[in-house]
């Protein structure tokens, strides 16, 4: 089938590559000529395991093409997917300008039936706005062209997006048209052949489902971080508590790991957008407000622990940071806890020696020329001569370090573990002072 995707960002690239790999004829349209040309050369602008090979294979097979020619894109696809950004406005609401611009573009050039699909994360009512924009544009042309608008939210995890798309746990389709349902079912049939994962619902419910899913996961994270802070004050160990509650099948173990808060392009933005939508609907979302505020404070937790440890201040201290991306297996630093910690440390007059196995280039882009910030070549170079080591992202290579070597490299043998990677008793045997999240009497409450 013929598919056009507007937007060659994270969602657009993964969606386009996976659909092409299933045999579809896919064109990705983007207004960024430089990015488009780099993609044609096989240069993928994001780090996502397996994506570069997938793009290369399908590009060489002629099933995946990148262009800036929107007219050609509209003429090409039966399915017109909108996968452009919906950045947060100052009030937390999702900015739909890019989405509606694409809708106008499609309406300006469409001459036959097509299905316009909103993949971008957008608030309830967005599909209605897209439909109205298409109607207005077609009316202005004096054209009568049939179309349908579908909400088809994505549920991709950065670092595991290819697997999520190829073997989805669900495919949500928001539509009220039986014909459209069958066409969407045919599009996703290669990915749901063994188990029918297609869930069809009305458009507004589909739009809310995406926000509800991310808000629920964010709530679990903030709740666990709140419990971790309580555990520190009452002398309990949150890791034992986690095992105790996770063994209950009604709770489970996913997303109940305490840490330095959630970041990335989705959870923070989507929680705030849902709060804004609730306000617009005349409802005060108290739980969501708490999720957001707890997360903002949790991003400062390692800094507060450092302040307590270094009673004479952080000015002039050198802090090693392990991990800059908001999670492992990505180079995404948007709203990452590391950025909050970096800003607080620099403001306090500290120097930073940072290392991330993938996000180094992104960190260089963000902090190039910033006094006091240095990127190290590897984890041990970052630790060399530092007054303390802070672990912010739980990359696999950080899980079993040489603690004896760390003790020798660090100016003062202190570790602030924001991801609870290590056994406190084992670390202490190497003569290292160890601070973690919610580990009871192991550290003063922050």
Task: Give the role of each language-model region.
Residues 1-446:
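Structural/interface elements that position substrates and couple domains in central-metabolism enzymes
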């Amino acid at each position: 089938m013929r598919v056009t995707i507007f937007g060659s960002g994270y969602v657009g690239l993964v969606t386009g590559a996976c659909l092409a790999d299933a045999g579809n004829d896919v064109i990705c349209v983007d207004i960024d000529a430089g990015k488009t040309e780099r993609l044609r050369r096989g240069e993928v602008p994001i780090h996502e395991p397996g994506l570069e090979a997938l793009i290369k294979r399908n590009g060489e097979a002629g099933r995946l093409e990148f262009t800036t020619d929107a007219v050609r894109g509209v003429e090409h696809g039966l399915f017109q997917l909108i996968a452009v950004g919906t950045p947060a406005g100052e009030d937390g609401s999702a900015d739909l300008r890019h989405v509606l611009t694409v809708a106008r573009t499609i309406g300006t050039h469409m001459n036959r039936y097509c299905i316009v699909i909103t993949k971008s994360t957008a608030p309830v009512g967005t599909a209605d706005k897209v439909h109205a924009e298409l109607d207005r544009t077609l009316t202005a042309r004096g054209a009568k062209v049939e179309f349908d608008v579908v909400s088809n939210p994505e549920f991709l995890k950065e670092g595991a997006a290819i697997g999520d798309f190829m073997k989805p746990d669900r495919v949500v389709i928001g539509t009220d048209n039986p014909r459209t349902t069958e066409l969407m079912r045919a599009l996703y049939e290669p990915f749901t052949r063994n188990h029918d994962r297609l869930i069809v619902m009305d458009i507004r419910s589909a739009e809310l489902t995406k926000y509800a899913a991310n808000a629920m996961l964010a709530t679990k994270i903030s709740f666990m971080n709140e419990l971790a802070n309580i555990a520190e004050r009452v002398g309990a160990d949150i890791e034992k508590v986690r095992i105790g509650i996770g063994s209950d099948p009604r709770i489970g173990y996913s997303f109940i790991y305490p840490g330095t808060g959630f970041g990335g392009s989705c959870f923070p933005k989507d929680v705030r957008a849902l709060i804004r939508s609730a306000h617009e609907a005349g409802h005060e979302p108290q739980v969501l407000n708490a999720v957001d505020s707890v997360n903002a404070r949790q991003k400062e937790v390692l800094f507060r622990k450092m302040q307590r440890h270094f009673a004479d201040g952080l000015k002039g201290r050198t802090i090693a940071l392990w991990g800059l991306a908001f999670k492992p297996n990505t180079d995404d630093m948007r709203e990452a806890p590391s950025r909050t910690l970096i800003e607080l440390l620099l403001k306090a007059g500290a120097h930073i020696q940072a290392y991330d196995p993938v996000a180094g280039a992104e960190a260089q882009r963000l902090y190039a020329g910033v006094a006091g910030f240095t990127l190290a070549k590897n984890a041990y170079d970052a630790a060399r001569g530092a007054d303390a080591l802070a672990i912010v992202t739980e990359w696999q290579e950080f899980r079993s370090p040489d603690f004896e070597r760390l003790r020798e490299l660090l100016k003062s043998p202190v570790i602030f573990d924001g991801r609870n990677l290590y056994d406190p008793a084992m670390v202490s045997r190497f003569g290292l002072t160890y601070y973690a999240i919610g580990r009871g009497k192991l550290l003063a409450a922050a």
